[in-house]
UniProtKB/Swiss-Prot annotation:
The lineage of its organism: Bacteria, Pseudomonadati, Pseudomonadota, Gammaproteobacteria, Enterobacterales. The gene is tmk. GO terms for molecular function: ATP binding; dTMP kinase activity. Phosphorylation of dTMP to form dTDP in both de novo and salvage pathways of dTTP synthesis. One of its GO terms (cellular component) is cytosol. Transmembrane segments: none annotated. This is Thymidylate kinase. GO terms for biological process: dTDP biosynthetic process; dTTP biosynthetic process; dUDP biosynthetic process. Keywords: ATP-binding, Kinase, Nucleotide biosynthesis, Nucleotide-binding, Transferase.
Length: 213
């Protein structure tokens, strides 16, 4: 079985870190042990600097980051990560487990920010070509639940401080995109933790078994 790229998506407070741990545990039980982990934005020295610029509310002082500048910084970080980390890992037979990928931009910037979705799709295709995750787990929570969890973790970053309306639009776009793409599996992350973990285990196990079929 060739290596695969699995991405975990969701609003702030959806439980992506816990989900990643469950994915890793499940893959190991299935005999898959050669894995690397990525996060977006970030994952390389350059991409981490871009992450700081786009997420740290104090990174550019009083200067307002425009919506299109934000998108371009996300894509600069993403293509650097894909070309220097993700693709080489996959080529070497290593599975890649990612905390966010392009679906975040389509949902947050296309839904939350209201940036033209055709422009985003064109930009994605120009930068990434036909490169896509093999499996995406979208952890669905309401903004009320997710932001309550995020606030309990401590200080919020620039995007986490957006309004409930922003996150409602983002969630709606996530759900819309998930309904259009069979590689995106939606997990109800408002359930009790054990139920969420069981749903992730079942989804990943069944998906891997289908690869072997």
């Amino acid at each position: 079985m060739r290596s695969k790229y699995i991405v975990i998506e969701g609003l702030e407070g959806a439980g992506k870190t816990t989900a990643r741990n469950v994915v890793v545990e499940t893959l190991e039980q299935l005999g898959i042990r050669d894995m690397v982990f990525t996060r977006e934005p970030g994952g390389t020295q350059l991409a981490e600097k871009l992450r700081s610029l786009v997420l740290d509310i104090k990174s550019v002082g009083d200067e307002v980051i425009t919506d299109k500048a934000e998108v371009l910084m996300f894509y600069a970080a993403r293509v650097q990560l894909v070309e220097t980390v993700i693709k080489p890992a996959l080529a070497n037979g290593t599975w890649v487990i990612g905390d966010r990928h392009d679906l975040s931009t389509q949902a947050y910037q296309g839904g939350g920010r209201g940036i033209d979705q055709h422009m985003l799709a064109t930009l994605r295709d120009a930068v990434l070509g036909d490169f896509r995750p093999d499996l995406t787990l979208y952890l669905d929570v309401t903004p009320e639940v997710g932001l309550k969890r995020a606030r309990a973790r401590g200080e919020l970053d620039r995007i986490e401080q957006e309004s409930f309306d922003f996150f409602n639009r983002t969630r709606a776009r996530y759900l819309e995109l998930a309904a259009q793409d069979k590689s995106i599996h939606t997990i109800d992350a408002t359930q009790p933790l054990e139920a969420v973990m069981d749903a992730i285990r079942t989804t990943v196990t069944n998906w891997v078994k289908e690869l072997d079929a």
